[in-house]
C-alpha cells in the first residue's frame, strides 16, 4: 500500500533530524496533530505523520521511519488503545529507546499518565478488548510499552490547558533535544534532567515518607501558593536523591521545569553567568540566551515566564549569590510555582530566601539495615543476614550504628564488604573502631572520604583548621571547645560548622559524625599549608616517639596526643625535643588504660631538663609531668587549659606570669605541690582542681583576684587548716571533703550553691552561714566534732539537701527550721538527735542507727511529701505511727524494741500507681496485732494496685510493685493457693484466662536458722506452656528488684513472712496468646527458693508458700472459675479477708457494695511433684539480705 505520509523539510537539514509522531488518527489528525505539524514545519523541523493509518500503511515502512528518527512524540489520547497500529509503533519506540537511539516525549492528551500506565477506566477497557484477538507475546509487548513510555518525562494537556501554548512547549523541547544531541553529551550542569530511560538516581529505604513530608511543605495541592523550600542536611544524607525523585514525580505537571545539579561545582568551574544561561535555556527551551546581566535577562523574559507556573530544583547551593544569579528578584515567578533549594549550609536558609526548611533526617535503624544489605549483599535479600548466619547480623547492626543512618556511608561500606567473609567484616569494623591507633596511610577512612570531601573542600582554611582541632576534643563541653578555638579572638566558628553540618551540638557537647571524625583525624595527620604554619596533628605513638627522639619536631606540628598506655618502656629525651615546635597549640600526654597511670615509673624523662619556648599553646595536659615546675621559657599568654595531674611539680612556674586566657587548672594528686603563688595573675580562671595535693598548707590571698572562679576543689588536702580571709565573688562550688586538719570555716563567697565539709575537723558553722541564700546542698557527713548547728542555718531558703550522717555528737536539731520549704533530703543517720525534725517538705529522711529516738511524731501522716523513711537499727523505737499516703519506702529492719504500729498503718492509700516496700525484718518484738495490720495493708495495696494498673498503659515494665516482710511463720488467710514447702501446683479450668488477670500476689515463709549473709532480695519469674501439639513455649524475665546494699553482717533470728505483688505483664500476654486447645484445663506450678546475693542457693528452708491471682475490677470481669472447678489436694482456704470484700466462688456471692471492687481469686491448690523450668520471679522484703525466687510453670492437657 502506498504511503501518503506528509513530510516537512527545510534546507540544510539532514533526513536524520526528524520527529516521528505516534497518535490515534481518527481522534487527533484534523485538530491537535494538524496544528502541531504546522508548528514544527514553521521551525524547520522534519516530521513524519502516517496519514493513511486506517488504510493499513505497510508496517515495515513505519518501523523504518521510527528507526530513522531522533525523536518520537507518543500522543496518548482516550481512544489510543483502540488501534493496534499505535501499539505496534509504541513497542518499536520502546525498543529504540532502550537502545538509546531514540528520545521519546510522551504527550498526554486529555488523559492522565497514571491512567495510561495502569490501564485504568475506558482507556484500559479498550486495551483489554483489543488484545483478546492477539497472542500472549504481543499482548505482553504492548502492555510493557504502555507501562514504560509514560514513565518518561512528558507533557500533560488537559481540558483547561491552552493548546497553542502546549504546542509551543513541545516545539521548544524538540528543538532543545535536537540541539543537545548534535552538540554531544551534556555538561554536568545541564539544565535538562536526564531522560527516564537512563539509569535512575540511587535511592534509599524510607524516601517515600521524606518525599511526602517535602510535598506537604511545598503545598502541591495549592495552585495559588508559591513556595520556596530549603532542603538541608549533612553530606550523604540524601538531599540530591530526594530532590531528584521529587522532580521526576512532579515535573510533568508543570509546563516549565528545570533541575540544575551540583551548582557549587558548576559555578566554580564555569562561573555564574554560564550557570544563569543554562538555567534560562532549560526553563524557556530557547537557544543562545546570552546573559550579560542577570536581572536584565529576567526582565527580558518576564512576560513569557509569567505565563505559566514553574518547578525549579537548585541542587547543592553553597552561597546566596548562586541563588540570586538564577532567581534574581523573583518578580518573574508566577503564583503557584514551586522552588526547591538543597544545601549543606543551614545558614543560607534565611527567611528572605525560603519560606520554610526541611532537614533530611537520618535513616531509621530498620531502613538503614535494609539500605546496607542492598549493597553488602548486592541487592539479594535472600542473602541478607539472619538467624543462623554466623555473626553477620550483629556485624551489620554495628556498621549501621557506626554510620548513624547516613545513606551514602552505608552504601560505600556495603560495597566495600560485598562478597567478603565474616572475618573480613570483623577486621573492617575493628579498623573503624581503632583507626586512630593505626599507622598513617593504613586507615579505612580513605574509602569514606567521598562522603565529606565536597563539603570539606568548600570550607575556608580557618574552618578546616577548626574542624580538625574539634576532632581532638570530640564530645567536650561547647564552652570549653569554643574557648580553645577562639582564644585568639571572638569568632562564630562553631556556629558556622554547625550550619554546614560538619559538627553538631547536643546537650551542650560538641560532636561530629563518626565517619567525619575518622576522616578528620586522618586529614590531621596529613594536612599541609602553604603558609607553613602548624597543620600536622600527631596521634600515633610510634610517630610521636620518633619525632621527639630524633628532634624532628618543627613548626608544621599543630598538636600532639600521646597515649602512655601504648608505650611499653621508659624513654629519655633531649631537653630541646619540643623546642622547634613554635606553632604547637595542643599537647596532651595521657593514658586511656588508667587516668592515674598507676605505674610508679615515669615513662617520659628529660634528664637534662626541658625547654618549652612555646607561645601558641592553648592546651597543656601532661599526666605525671616529671619536673618540679613548668619550664621558665614557657609563655602561658595563650594558655586556656592546664592539666598536670599526678605530677612532680612543687609550684606551677616561677613568679607570677600573665595568663589572661587561662580558665581551667587541674593539678590533682600532685603531692609535692606546696604553693600556688604563680597563678596570681590568672584573673580569668574559672575552675581550680587541687584534689589530693597533700603538701598544700595554705591558699594565697591573691586568689581574691580570681573574679570568675566558680569551682574550687580541695578534697583530700590533708595539710590545709583554713582558708584566707578573701571573697571569691563568683564561687559556686567549694569542696573541702577529707581535709582532716581543717578546723575553721568562714564564708568566702555569698554565691555558694554547693558546700562540701564532710570529713573535716570543724566543731561549728559560722553564724553568718545564713548569708548563703543560694546554697542548695550542704554536706557535713562524718564531722565527728560538730556539736551544734546555728539557728541561722534555718535561713537558707534555697537548701534542698542537708547531709549530717555520722555527726555523732550532734544531739539537737533547731525547731526554728520548720519554714525551710525547699529541703527535700535530710540525712541524720548515726547522730544523737532525740526527736524527728518537723520539716514537712522532706521527701527522704534517714535516721538509721539512732539510739536516742524512741517514738516518731504522731503527725507523721501529715508529711505528704515524704517518700523514703529509713529507720534501720533504731533500737529504742517502740511504735510506728500512721504513715503518710505517698510513702514508697519504709525500712525498720533491726528495730529490736518495736512492738506496735498504727491502725490503719497508712492514713489513706492513693489511687494512683505507687510502688512501695515496707520492711519489718528482725523486729522480733513485733506484736501479733501489728503483724495482722501489716497483712491487712498488704491486701488493700494489692487491690488498689490492680485497679491502678487497669488505668495504666500496658507498655509499662513488668516489675515488683509492692513488697513487705516481717517476723512470722503463718501464711495469711487470703492467699487462695498455698502449700507446705516451696512448691505450689494447681489446675485451672478451661477459659480461666478470660478473667482479665491483673497480677499475682505472692507469699513465702522462710526459716533462716541463725544465718549470716549480705545477699540481695530479688524475685524472678518463669513460665512454660504446652500448645497441645507436643511442643511448648516459655518466657523468662526479671520481674523487678528492690535491692538495698548493706555491709553489716548480722544474725537473722526467726522465721519471716514475705509478701509481694507483681503485674507480670509478660506472663499475662503469654496467657492471652495461648495456641493450645481452646477448651483444655491448664496445669501450672510455682516454686519458691532463697538465693544469696551472688545468685547461689542459700542453705535456708522454705516452710510455706502460696499465691493468689488478682483480677481487674468487678465491673469489667468475666465470670471467674469456681472452687469446684479448681482441682487440688490441699484444703480449700475459705477464711474471709479482714474487710470481707472477697467473693465466695463456690456460692457465687458478690462483693459487698461499696467495698474494694478488685477481685483476688480464692480457690484450692494442688501439691506438685516436679517442675520443668528454672525461671525466677522476685520481691524484696528482707533488708536486701536474701533472694526469694519463684518458679512458674504452665502447660495444657
Curated annotation (Swiss-Prot):
Disruption phenotype: Shade avoidance phenotype in the absence of shade and enhanced growth of the bacterial pathogen P.syringae pv. tomato DC3000 (avirulent avrRpt2 strain). The constitutive shade avoidance phenotype can be rescued by RPS4, a TIR-NBS-LRR protein that confers resistance against bacterium Pseudomonas syringae.
Known EC number: 3.2.2.6
Domain (NB-ARC): residue spans on this chain: 210-480
Keyword set includes Methyltransferase: no
Catalysed reactions, semicolon-separated: NAD(+) + H2O = ADP-D-ribose + nicotinamide + H(+)
Domain of life where this protein originates: Eukaryota
LRR repeats: 614-636, 638-659, 694-716, 728-749, 750-774, 776-796, 797-819, 820-843, 845-862, 863-889
InterPro entries: C-JID, Disease_R_plants, Leu-rich_rpt_3, LRR_dom_sf, LRR_R13L4/SHOC2-like, NB-ARC, P-loop_NTPase, TIR_dom
Any GO BP: response to light stimulus
GO molecular function terms listed in the Swiss-Prot or TrEMBL record: ADP binding; ATP binding; NAD+ nucleosidase activity, cyclic ADP-ribose generating
Gene3D superfamilies, per database record: P-loop containing nucleotide triphosphate hydrolases, Ribonuclease Inhibitor, Toll/interleukin-1 receptor homology (TIR) domain
Function: TIR-NB-LRR receptor-like protein that functions in photomorphogenic development. May function downstream of phytochrome B (phyB) signaling.
UniProt name for this protein: Disease resistance-like protein CSA1
Highest classification ranks of the organism: Eukaryota, Viridiplantae, Streptophyta, Embryophyta, Tracheophyta
Amino acid at each position: 500500500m502506498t504511503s501518503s505520509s506528509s513530510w516537512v523539510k527545510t534546507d540544510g537539514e539532514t533526513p536524520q533530524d526528524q520527529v516521528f509522531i505516534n497518535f490515534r488518527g481518527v481522534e487527533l489528525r484534523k485538530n491537535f496533530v494538524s496544528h502541531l505539524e504546522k508548528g514544527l514545519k514553521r521551525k524547520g523541523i522534519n516530521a513524519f505523520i502516517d496519514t493513511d493509518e486506517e488504510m493499513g500503511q505497510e508496517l515495515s515502512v513505519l518501523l523504518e521511519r521510527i528507526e530513522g528518527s531522533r525523536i518520537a512524540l507518543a500522543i496518548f489520547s482516550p481512544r489510543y488503545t483502540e488501534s493496534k497500529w499505535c501499539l505496534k509503533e509504541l513497542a518499536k519506540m520502546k525498543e529504540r529507546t532502550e537502545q538509546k537511539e531514540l528520545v521519546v516525549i510522551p504527550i498526554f492528551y486529555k488523559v492522565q499518565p497514571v491512567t495510561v500506565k495502569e490501564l485504568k477506566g475506558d482507556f484500559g477497557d479498550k486495551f483489554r478488548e483489543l488484545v483478546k484477538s492477539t497472542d500472549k507475546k504481543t499482548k505482553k509487548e504492548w502492555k510493557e510499552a504502555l507501562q514504560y513510555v509514560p514513565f518518561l518525562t512528558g507533557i500533560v494537556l488537559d481540558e483547561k490547558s491552552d493548546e497553542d501554548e502546549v504546542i509551543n512547549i513541545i516545539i521548544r523541547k524538540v528543538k532543545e533535544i535536537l540541539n543537545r544531541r548534535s552538540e554531544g553529551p551534556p555538561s554536568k550542569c545541564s539544565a535538562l534532567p536526564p531522560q527516564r530511560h537512563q539509569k535512575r538516581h540511587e535511592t534509599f529505604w524510607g524516601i517515600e515518607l521524606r518525599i511526602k513530608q517535602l510535598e506537604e511543605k511545598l503545598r502541591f495541592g495549592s495552585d495559588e501558593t508559591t513556595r520556596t523550600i530549603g532542603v538541608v542536611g549533612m553530606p550523604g544524607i540524601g538531599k540530591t536523591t530526594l530532590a531528584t525523585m521529587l522532580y521526576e514525580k512532579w515535573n510533568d505537571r508543570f509546563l516549565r521545569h528545570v533541575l540544575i545539579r551540583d551548582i557549587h561545582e558548576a559555578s566554580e568551574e564555569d562561573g555564574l553567568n554560564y550557570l544563569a544561561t543554562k538555567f534560562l535555556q532549560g526553563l524557556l527551551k530557547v537557544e543562545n540566551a546570552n546573559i550579560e546581566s542577570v536581572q536584565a535577562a529576567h526582565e527580558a523574559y518576564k512576560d513569557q515566564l509569567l505565563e505559566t507556573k514553574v518547578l525549579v530544583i537548585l541542587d547543592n547551593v553553597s552561597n546566596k549569590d548562586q541563588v540570586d544569579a538564577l532567581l534574581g528578584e523573583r518578580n518573574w515567578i508566577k503564583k503557584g510555582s514551586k522552588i526547591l533549594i538543597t544545601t549543606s549550609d543551614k545558614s543560607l536558609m534565611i527567611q528572605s530566601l525560603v519560606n520554610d526548611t526541611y532537614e533530611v533526617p537520618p535513616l531509621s535503624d530498620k531502613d538503614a539495615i535494609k539500605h546496607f544489605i542492598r549493597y553488602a549483599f548486592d541487592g539479594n535479600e535472600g542473602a541478607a543476614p539472619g538467624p543462623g548466619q554466623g555473626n553477620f547480623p550483629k556485624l551489620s547492626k554495628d556498621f549501621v550504628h557506626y554510620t548513624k543512618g547516613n545513606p551514602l556511608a552505608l552504601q560505600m561500606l556495603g560495597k566495600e564488604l560485598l562478597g567478603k567473609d565474616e572475618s573480613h567484616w570483623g577486621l573492617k569494623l575493628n579498623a573503624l573502631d581503632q583507626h586512630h591507633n593505626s599507622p598513617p596511610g593504613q586507615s579505612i577512612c580513605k574509602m569514606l572520604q567521598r562522603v565529606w570531601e565536597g563539603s570539606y573542600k568548600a570550607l575556608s582554611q580557618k574552618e578546616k583548621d577548626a574542624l580538625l582541632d574539634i576532632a581532638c576534643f570530640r564530645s567536650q563541653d561547647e564552652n570549653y571547645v569554643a574557648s580553645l578555638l577562639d582564644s585568639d579572638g571572638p569568632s562564630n566558628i562553631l556556629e558556622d560548622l554547625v550550619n554546614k553540618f560538619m559538627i553538631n551540638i547536643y546537650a551542650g557537647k560538641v560532636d561530629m559524625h563518626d565517619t567525619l571524625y575518622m576522616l578528620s583525624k586522618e586529614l590531621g595527620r596529613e594536612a599541609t599549608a602553604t603558609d607553613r604554619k602548624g597543620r600536622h596533628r600527631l596521634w600515633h605513638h610510634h610517630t610521636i616517639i620518633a619525632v621527639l627522639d630524633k628532634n624532628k619536631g618543627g613548626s608544621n606540628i599543630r598538636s600532639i596526643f600521646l597515649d602512655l598506655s601504648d608505650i611499653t618502656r621508659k624513654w629519655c629525651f633531649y631537653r630541646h625535643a619540643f623546642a622547634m615546635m613554635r606553632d604547637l597549640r595542643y599537647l596532651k600526654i595521657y593514658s586511656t588504660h588508667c587516668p592515674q597511670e598507676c605505674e610508679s615509673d615515669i615513662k617520659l624523662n628529660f634528664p637534662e631538663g626541658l625547654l618549652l619556648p612555646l607561645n601558641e599553646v592553648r592546651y597543656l595536659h601532661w599526666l605525671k609531668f616529671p619536673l618540679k615546675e613548668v619550664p621558665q621559657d614557657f609563655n602561658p599568654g595563650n594558655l586556656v587549659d592546664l592539666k598536670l595531674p599526678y605530677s612532680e611539680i612543687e609550684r606551677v612556674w616561677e613568679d607570677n606570669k600573665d595568663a589572661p586566657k587561662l580558665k581551667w587548672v587541674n593539678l590533682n594528686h600532685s603531692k609535692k605541690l606546696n604553693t600556688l603563688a604563680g597563678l596570681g595573675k590568672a584573673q580569668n580562671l574559672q575552675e581550680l582542681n587541687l584534689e589530693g595535693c597533700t603538701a598544700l598548707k595554705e591558699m594565697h590571698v591573691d586568689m581574691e583576684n580570681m573574679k570568675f572562679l566558680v569551682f574550687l576543689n580541695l578534697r583530700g588536702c590533708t595539710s590545709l587548716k583554713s582558708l584566707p580571709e578573701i571573697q571569691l565573688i563568683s564561687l559556686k562550688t567549694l569542696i573541702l571533703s577529707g581535709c582532716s586538719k581543717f578546723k575553721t570555716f568562714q564564708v568566702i563567697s555569698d554565691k555558694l550553691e554547693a558546700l562540701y565539709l564532710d570529713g573535716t575537723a570543724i566543731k561549728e558553722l559560722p553564724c553568718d552561714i545564713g548569708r548563703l541564700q543560694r546554697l542548695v546542698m550542704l554536706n557535713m557527713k562524718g564531722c565527728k566534732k560538730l556539736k551544734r548547728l546555728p539557728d541561722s542555718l534555718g535561713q537558707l531558703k534555697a537548701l534542698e539537701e542537708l547531709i549530717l550522717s555520722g555527726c555523732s555528737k550532734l544531739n539537737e536539731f533547731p525547731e526554728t527550721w520548720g519554714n525551710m520549704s525547699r529541703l527535700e533530703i535530710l540525712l541524720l543517720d548515726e547522730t544523737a538527735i532525740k526527736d524527728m525534725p518537723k520539716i514537712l517538705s522532706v521527701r527522704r529522711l534517714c535516721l538509721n542507727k539512732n539510739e536516742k529516738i524512741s517514738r516518731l511524731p504522731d503527725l507523721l501522716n501529715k508529711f505528704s511529701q515524704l517518700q523514703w523513711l529509713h529507720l534501720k537499727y533504731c533500737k529504742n523505737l517502740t511504735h510506728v505511727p500512721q504513715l503518710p499516703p505517698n510513702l514508697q519506702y519504709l525500712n525498720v529492719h533491726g528495730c529490736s524494741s518495736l512492738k506496735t504500729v498504727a491502725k490503719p498503718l497508712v492514713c489513706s492509700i492513693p489511687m494512683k500507681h505507687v510502688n512501695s516496700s515496707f520492711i519489718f525484718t528482725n523486729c522480733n518484738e513485733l506484736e501479733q496485732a501489728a503483724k495482722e495490720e501489716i497483712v491487712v495493708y498488704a491486701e488493700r495495696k494489692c487491690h488498689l494496685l490492680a485497679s491502678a494498673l487497669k488505668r495504666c498503659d500496658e507498655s509499662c515494665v513488668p516489675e515488683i510493685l509492692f513488697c513487705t516482710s516481717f517476723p512470722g511463720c503463718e501464711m495469711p488467710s487470703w492467699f487462695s493457693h498455698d502449700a507446705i514447702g516451696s512448691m505450689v501446683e494447681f489446675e485451672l479450668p478451661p477459659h480461666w484466662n478470660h478473667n482479665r488477670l491483673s497480677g499475682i500476689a505472692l507469699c513465702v515463709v522462710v526459716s533462716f536458722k541463725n544465718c549470716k549473709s549480705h545477699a540481695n532480695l530479688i524475685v524472678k519469674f518463669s513460665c512454660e506452656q504446652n500448645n497441645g501439639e507436643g511442643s511448648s513455649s516459655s518466657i523468662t524475665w526479671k520481674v523487678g528488684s528492690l535491692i538495698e546494699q548493706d555491709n553489716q553482717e548480722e544474725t537473722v533470728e526467726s522465721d519471716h513472712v514475705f509478701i509481694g505483688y507483681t503485674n507480670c505483664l509478660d506472663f499475662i500476654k503469654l496467657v492471652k496468646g495461648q495456641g493450645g486447645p481452646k477448651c483444655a484445663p491448664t496445669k501450672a506450678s510455682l516454686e519458691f527458693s532463697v538465693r544469696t546475693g551472688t545468685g547461689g542457693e542459700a542453705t535456708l528452708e522454705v516452710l510455706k508458700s502460696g499465691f493468689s491471682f488478682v483480677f481487674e475490677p468487678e465491673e469489667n470481669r468475666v465470670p471467674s472459675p469456681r472452687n469446684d472447678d479448681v482441682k487440688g489436694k490441699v484444703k480449700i482456704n475459705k477464711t474471709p479477708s479482714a474487710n470481707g470484700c472477697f467473693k465466695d466462688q463456690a456460692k457465687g456471692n458478690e462483693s459487698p457494695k461499696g467495698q474494694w471492687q478488685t477481685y483476688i481469686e480464692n480457690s484450692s491448690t494442688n501439691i506438685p511433684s516436679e517442675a520443668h523450668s528454672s525461671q525466677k520471679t522476685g520481691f524484696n522484703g528482707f533488708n536486701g539480705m536474701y533472694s526469694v525466687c519463684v518458679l512458674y510453670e504452665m502447660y495444657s492437657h
